[in-house]
UniProtKB/Swiss-Prot annotation:
Signal peptide extent: none
Protein name: Guanine nucleotide-binding protein subunit gamma
Major place of residence: membrane
Functional summary from the UniProt entry: Guanine nucleotide-binding proteins (G proteins) are involved as a modulator or transducer in various transmembrane signaling systems. This major G-protein of the squid photoreceptor is involved in visual transduction. The beta and gamma chains are required for the GTPase activity, for replacement of GDP by GTP, and for G protein-effector interaction.
Residues with a covalently attached lipid (S-geranylgeranyl cysteine): 84
Keyword check for Transcription regulation: no
Native source organism of the sequence: Loligo forbesii (Veined squid)
Keywords assigned by UniProt, alphabetized: Cell membrane, Lipoprotein, Membrane, Methylation, Prenylation, Sensory transduction, Transducer, Vision
Domain of life of the native organism: Eukaryota
Subcellular location: Cell membrane
Post-translational modification: The N-terminus is blocked.
């Protein structure tokens, strides 16, 4: 069995020696890895932004936001006359 294992190891070593990766392929692999890292960074940032938005909504409910108001009679009159409203 030891002889068989020795032969297998030699074959594996020979296969590893044959696997020479050209520089172009290395550049491609590195570029893809950098892109993947950039995507994960963007995902992390977007997740933290969502978490911050949720916490803000929890602290400050949006019920108090001022909605469209009814028109004020005095303001409407001054707009028609073109003059200034003096108080």
């Amino acid at each position: 069995m030891n002889k068989m294992q020795g032969k297998k190891k030699k074959k594996e070593e020979e296969e590893e020696e044959e696997r020479i990766i050209p520089p172009e392929l290395w550049k491609l692999i590195i570029e893809q890895y950098k892109r993947q890292l950039a995507k994960t960074d963007v995902m992390k940032v977007s997740e933290t932004v969502k978490l911050h938005e949720e916490k803000i909504k929890e602290k400050v409910p949006t019920d108090h936001i001022i909605h469209a108001q009814k028109p004020n009679a005095w303001v409407e009159e001054t707009k028609k006359s073109g003059g200034c409203l003096l108080v």
